[in-house]
């Protein structure tokens, strides 16, 4: 009904993005460690993150910004700067799967939708760079066929021993494969992941972000009743590798496909680039004609992003917070950017505030 503006989920292999694509909503998958996971039941704790579902990119990013805070109680929490949305540079290079490696599983409507979305990106002036996605698929394969399944086993090990029928039969079938892995297998998979990361690194350094289909195709409930494993595996084509590569991402609805099903596209960036992928998503959202989720409410066009976003304030500092001095790091940790050195006019006076410990400077 459009009453709820956002909800939280978790994302290990795409659970924060695939449902968003299927339901015409935004799915924001943050950088690993940026949102506290205290109290969250994990799937794979080392690569899990809390995710955000919302009707619009702006709502999703606002929730992310509020939740982005270091948590000392969460051993996987990391400190991240809170950076605002801003107008993306039109010279930005965006990587997409090339024609030889892109996968749609014979869904022509999905292929046409993605091609149309890429044409929009080109119209904004972005440089599109087709890349071979086979190494990404190899990494995705590790998540469910490799020893990360054993990490899932640690979460429900006791339940499987005491009451195995309490676990869905398909889930049980997948996770019980963990018994076949040894500690040596785990190290081999980590070595394999490092090798694939090395192979992919030149690709990722040649572009600012990736743009992929959120899902390669759609499946019905009936499809999943016949074969619950293959369709789910296919739905993770463009999601399963993301957390293993420590990337962030956002799934944003686009114009509906020609058959009426929801259109969608996903932007992926490196860790800490959450504001960049959200900024390009909101730019993309601005030029789409769609309803919000399952409602009949039309998307209201978001405000134009500015090069110098109004989330920034111009401030002048004196004393130890100046560039190169001992407290300047406090400003930088809050996302401050140095602009210029300057001098005060003769009307200003500089004071030592001796009643403070340590003594602080004052400028009037």
Regions found by a protein language model. Give the residues of each.
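Short glycine-/acidic-enriched loop or helix-start segments at secondary-structure transitions
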Residues: 18, 105-106, 140, 220-223, ...
